[in-house]
Amino acid sequence: MMRLGLVVGYSGSRIELPMDLVKAADEMGYYALWTSEAYGSDAVTPLAWMGAQTQHIKLGTAIMQMPGRSPAMTAMTAMTLDQLSGGRFLLGLGLSGPQVAEGWHGVAYGKPLGKTREYVEICRKIFKREEALVHEGEHYGVPYRGEDATGLGKPLKSILHSRPDIPIYLASIGPKNVTLTAEIADGWLPFIFSPRHYDSVYKTQIDEGFAKAGGGKGIHNFDIAPSISVIIDDDLENAYNRVKPLLALYIGGMGAKDKNFYN
């Protein structure tokens, strides 16, 4: 089943939300609003603002940057917004890239597959509240036990009672990341996605992830939520020209000259 969403994205030098469009999408039965972030406006605050002025539409991040937040901070934010919105939040996560992780957030980009798996695992533990949080992994350790630890940290359980199954979506591009997404996430946020090439490019990777997940997971209970640019214009050439700058930014100008994950 196909559902429609509205991508609000992130701001330029000033944040201006298209509230007329947002309210219309809510009234017309659109499935979700999606926000994003780079190194300016964040993805969550606009959703809180829009969520307070809508009733039905789901509120998704596409994406919240994992390097910018600890897993616990992300889980706290997700639980808070989900409860305030009446269970409408969709947690979309992504690693961004080395340029933003290291150049903006000041943390190592590291090993994306391992970090993503642990990050999602910690978030789900916090949502479920089955026990106090303990995680001992290669990339994250909770409670912190490093050489500079005080030794006073102890396992904690969220005070806020959350919906235990807040949906988690992952943005992924590389084959191994796509497989990981199908294995551990509830949905996938692909970029520059062409449905006609799904079988030849992505199907094997997605099916491999489903097989690793087990439990009857498959395309029937997994969301694929690509974003596309829609331009309404009687002049086809003019419509093309309005789309080209965004594509050029990601394909040719995003990241470093010798390392761009989008091309």
Put a short name on every predicted segment:
Residues 110-158, 199-263:
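An alpha-helical appendage that flanks or caps ligand/catalytic pockets
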Residues 4-8, 33-35, 59-62, 89-93, ...:
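Hydrophobic faces of well-ordered beta-strands that scaffold small-molecule active sites
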Residues 13-24, 77, 172-180:
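Short, acidic/polar
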Residues 67-80, 110:
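Glycine-rich anion/phosphate-binding loops
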Residues 29, 50, 81, 123, ...:
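Conserved, mostly hydrophobic/aromatic
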Residues 1-61, 67, 166:
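N-terminal beta1-alpha1-beta2 module of alpha/beta enzyme domains
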Residues 1-9, 60, 98-101, 140-165, ...:
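N-terminal small/glycine-rich loop or linker at the start of catalytic domains
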Residues 41-48, 194-209:
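Active-site-adjacent beta->alpha loops and helix N-cap segments on the catalytic face
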